[in-house]
Curated annotation (Swiss-Prot):
GO terms for molecular function: RNA binding. GO terms for cellular component: mitochondrial matrix; mitochondrion; ribonucleoprotein granule. Its main location: mitochondrion. InterPro entries: FAST_2, FAST_kinase, FAST_Leu-rich, RAP. It comes from the Eukaryota. Residues 33-48 have a biased composition (Polar residues). Residues 30-49 are annotated as: Disordered. This is FAST kinase domain-containing protein 4. Residues 1-112 form a transit peptide. It is found in: Mitochondrion matrix.
Amino acid sequence: MAARLVRRCTCLLREAARLAPAVSPVGQLRLPQGTQKPLTSSATSPSSRLPGLLSEFVEKEQVFTPYTGRQEVEQLIEKATQPEELLELLGSGHCLQQNHAALALIQLSRLLSEKPKDKAALIQDARFWQLLHLVNSQITVVWHGTLVKLLRSLYTLGLPATSKDLRSVEQEVRWRMRRLKYKHLAFLAESSATYMQEQGSRELLAELLVHLERRWAEIEDRRMVVAMMMKTGHLSESLMNRLEDKCLELVEQFGPEELRKVLVTLAAQNRRSVPLLRAISYHLVQKPFPLTKSILLDLAYAYGKLGFHQTQVFQRLAADLLPHTPSMTSSEVARCTKSFAFLKWLNLPLFEAFVQHVLDRAQSITLPHLCNMLLAFARVNFRPEREDPFFSLVHEKLGSELVGLEPALQVDVVWALCVLQQVREAELQAVLCPEFHTQFLGGKSPKDQSTFQKLLHINATAQLEHPEYTGPLLPTSALVPSPSALEQKMTPLQKELQETLKGLLGSADKGSFMVPTQYGWVLDAEVLLDTESQLLPLRDFVAPHLTPPSGSQPLPPGAKRLAFLRWEFPNFNSRSKDLLGRFMLARRHLLAAGFLLVDVPYYEWMELKSEWQKSAYLKDKMRKAVAEELAK
């Protein structure tokens, strides 16, 4: 504090010495009536104890002079259209006082905002540094609002991080931090946070974020809270929490544009703030304000990215987007389809409109957009009414360009065609050939393991659903599910299902649990029944679905192999009892492999309260599966 006081006194003495001849005629307030008398501080003020010229100058600072209009210098600065006009003010006889030099630098940064070459030339100009030194000498009397704009301008002008003048302005900002209004702090954070990180001013940035967090209750403007969430929220977890609280408080005042910005910001930072998302969803449903196409697309993206399900919002988004479909670009259609697929929300009229959009622009649509739509359709298991022309277009586009796609994307596309039952032999061969699939064998990353899991599904499709397919196939040694498929945490439904089945089986050799198959699917349980529906020991009989196949005895005539499959809530489309495409593919594969399926969906199991009810439910399911097979 002592060093700070000495610095300020030095600056005041220097200014007082320079302005001393002009003190007497300027420093009085002309009263409308009565004796004209300077209005100075009381005798007990600190300035009254300062000696000589410093005391006179401080008293001069405290004299109130009425504002009679814009000074000529300020007008010249504001009207300047070229940097040279501002630099010439130094030698043209104009007296640059208080904020003038700072305002000139701010205007310089505005004029050069899009001229990086001119910035480099400016920094080499001696007049620029003279102007900067003048600001530094007057830094203590620069107004708060001008000071924060000045710091932002110095960052944008590209001053070196070691510049003493830049550090001086930064230090002045730190000294005044407590006195700055919240809007000044917010402006500085929004406009200069990136520069502070790049310029090595991390201490100033950290202090700024602390003040913003502590004084968050001062935010009263919805524009300010939205802008801060977008520009600075990602820099501080605690600040973002406060901004979310303030946003929740002001959300009733938000218009569609503010709601869009908040949602996109949350999605970009992957922050699933449930109370805020619920409040935004409520206002989207209740308020009748119109939503433009771009806002609708951004809302769909944000909800999809965050995985936040709100049926009424999705219904409004789908209904409002449908009329915009003819005017949408292929990129927007692909993006929107992908967003709704992430949400597992299948709106048939909207998806059919997307298909029609693609067919109407068959010659111009690009393969990446078509691939995104194909993957989205496979996720929600959507089969369009005009599937023949649509998939003909897909195969036509893939014919020569499939091998040019990124390897993981090639697997995704062929897998999606398998889900939708539209894959062709050439596409199977493209990803099952040894030259291609070996790059994914033994992959340790989650992405590589996921891709190889899809290769197992593609291989199973070739074996089970395409009897005319002649190869190639994956090697037998590779037909092993990834460890992650068996290491997943046990769910309550899975645990209860296993406990109930163990009670029904009575003996451990009569059934198996968590059975990995060579098709890439894991069975929750497997049992073997003879013609009398009696349980048989599994280990005694051949099991071709395992890797490697086990057992030596062939199945008795009429024996049936049952697979139990539990279906959790995430396995279904939103607000539907229709399985997602991935799980429909699993059912098809296991049926083609000779299993009788016992489906155990969560919504049926939840209604069973006692162990007796659960046992009776499974027995009834097994009887129905056998009866359906016999009825064929």
